[in-house]
């Protein structure tokens, strides 16, 4: 197995695979520290300046490790970028055979049952919603993942989205007639089988809050968890675990 020096040196694996790659001492040192933390199941906080190349510095050690790792990003856009661009790049450079998976929250996946429910529903009289529903139905016949993010023409706040996605409250689970074809179920199965799972902070802490209730969790257990943009964690975590008191309650 390659060492960190084999990966990040001037004649290393990244330099050989990525045009214009320039070794940076801070990047190599960070990668070594991340590798050490993973190998010893330790904790590590890294503050890296702009241009350090921190993404490669944590992806390479994760790919070189034997256990399952979760990588969490600050936003869904960064999650997409990491999974579709950075991770394949480093994986190819290392010649890694590790399995990877992208996992998003439930509302990001098409619900086949709800699409069927609302198809032909005469109560959907507004042209905008009907047009969006037709667009979703056309896309549903070709998508492999059911990830609503694939539908670039659909606005993020499209009014049809609550009609074609599910929530914890309205999901039928194993009682759903489309359970075996459910895109959310498929995404979780892929995550269970993967070595590297890419999530985002909101999903991570929402899932942790669900774990506290004893059901409904999506993210599998892992040997290592890596948070990118970790400075966002206090605000996001407090949304799910914080308590607030008013002055009236205190008195």
Language-model features: where?
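Conserved phosphoryl-transfer catalytic core
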Residues: 230-231, 235-251
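Conserved pre-motif I regulatory segment
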Residues: 2-46
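A substrate-engagement module of RecA-like helicase motors
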Residues: 2-17, 67-197, 202
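Short basic/glycine-enriched coil/helix segment immediately N-terminal to the Walker B
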Residues: 185-195, 211-223
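The conserved Walker
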Residues: 50
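Walker A/P-loop NTP-binding motif
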Residues: 35-36, 55-68, 85-89
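Residues immediately C-terminal
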Residues: 78, 204, 232-235
């Amino acid at each position: 197995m390659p060492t960190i020096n084999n990966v990040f040196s001037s004649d290393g694996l990244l330099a050989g695979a990525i045009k214009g790659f320039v070794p940076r001492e801070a990047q190599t040192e960070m990668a070594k520290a991340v590798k050490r933390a993973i190998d010893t199941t330790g904790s590590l906080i890294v503050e890296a300046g702009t241009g350090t190349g921190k993404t490669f510095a944590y992806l390479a050690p994760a790919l070189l490790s034997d256990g399952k790792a979760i990588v969490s990003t600050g936003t869904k856009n960064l999650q997409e970028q990491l999974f579709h661009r950075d991770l394949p790049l480093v994986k190819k450079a290392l010649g890694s055979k590790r399995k990877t998976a992208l996992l998003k929250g439930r509302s990001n996946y098409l619900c086949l049952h709800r699409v069927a429910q609302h198809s032909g529903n005469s109560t959907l009289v507004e042209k905008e919603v009907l047009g969006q529903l037709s667009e979703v139905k056309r896309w549903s016949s070709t998508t492999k993942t059911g990830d609503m993010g694939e539908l670039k023409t659909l606005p993020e706040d499209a009014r049809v989205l609550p009609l074609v996605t599910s929530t914890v409250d309205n999901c039928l689970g194993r009682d759903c007639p489309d359970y075996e074809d459910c895109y959310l179920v498929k995404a979780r199965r892929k995550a269970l089988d993967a070595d590297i799972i890419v999530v985002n902070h909101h999903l991570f802490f929402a899932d942790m809050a669900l774990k506290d209730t004893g059901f409904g969790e999506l993210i599998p257990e892992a040997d290592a968890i890596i948070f990118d943009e970790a400075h966002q964690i206090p605000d996001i975590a407090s949304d799910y675990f914080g308590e607030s008191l008013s002055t009236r309650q205190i008195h």
